[in-house]
Swiss-Prot record:
Basic and acidic residues: compositionally biased ranges: 182-191
Gene giving rise to this polypeptide: DPB4
Lineage, highest ranks first: Eukaryota, Fungi, Dikarya, Ascomycota, Saccharomycotina
Main location: nucleus
InterPro entries from the UniProt entry: DNA_Pol-Epsilon_Subunit, Histone-fold
Miscellaneous information on this protein: In eukaryotes there are five DNA polymerases: alpha, beta, gamma, delta, and epsilon which are responsible for different reactions of DNA synthesis.
GO biological process annotation, one example: error-prone translesion synthesis
Residue ranges of the region described as Disordered: 154-191
Function, in words: As accessory component of the DNA polymerase epsilon (DNA polymerase II) participates in chromosomal DNA replication.
Bias (Acidic residues) ranges: 172-181
GO molecular function: DNA polymerase processivity factor activity; double-stranded DNA binding; nucleosomal DNA binding; protein heterodimerization activity; single-stranded DNA 3'-5' DNA exonuclease activity; single-stranded DNA binding
Name the UniProt record assigns to this protein: DNA polymerase epsilon subunit D
Length: 191
């Protein structure tokens, strides 16, 4: 028997959950990336440009001027336009990546599919930038694993020998939330 309050449709059938999902209206607002994330990325751009100018000046042997970073002010309409354009771009990129994965009889996309989709879309200039960001992200993950392993060693929780990366392979690793819940066992380690 269906939950209380469900009504039969015109054919006399109770709606199923998939039927209910089809009836929901999905708007563009539901699909947009969070405004805070988009604005944080937008505010990084002037800082990155300033760093690039300083690096280029240092390579040429020119004196490097250290100017304070300019504050970026983005209006509400501009932030909404950034949200919409970022969402459309990422969905378009994912569509191409899915097509490339489908051509190779795979159901999921991997990093190579995304990078090849950038070329396929006509944005080969973004490929090195995305690859560099991905490398930075993977390095940050490795650093986090190593820091976690060092904390386990200092806390006396490690029972195994470290692998070649200096980390430990545990099947039942504790989550970061569990580590945060036990502050009396943590030691501060500065990188």
């Amino acid at each position: 028997m269906p939950p209380k309050g469900w009504r039969k449709d015109a054919q006399g059938n109770y709606p199923t959950t998939s039927y209910m999902k089809e009836q929901e209206n999905v708007t563009m607002q539901d699909l947009l990336f969070p405004r805070s994330v988009i604005m944080a990325l937008a505010k990084e751009v002037p800082e990155m440009q300033q760093q690039q100018v300083q690096v280029q000046a240092a390579e040429k042997g020119e004196p490097v001027e250290k100017t304070p970073a300019k504050k970026l002010v983005v209006t509400k309409d501009a932030s909404m336009a950034l949200q919409h354009s970022a969402t459309v771009f990422v969905n378009h990129l994912l569509m191409y990546a899915r097509e490339l994965a489908k051509e190779q009889d795979r159901r999921s996309c991997n990093v190579d599919d995304i990078l090849n989709a950038l070329e396929h879309m006509g944005h080969p200039g973004l490929k090195p930038l995305v690859a560099n960001r991905l490398d930075d992200y993977q390095e940050a993950l490795e650093w986090k694993k190593q820091l976690k392993a060092q904390l386990q060693i200092l806390n006396g929780e490690a029972e195994e020998e470290p692998n070649e990366l200096g980390t430990y392979d545990h099947d039942n690793e504790t989550d970061d939330e569990e580590i945060r819940d036990e502050p009396e066992k943590k030691l501060k380690v500065e990188p």
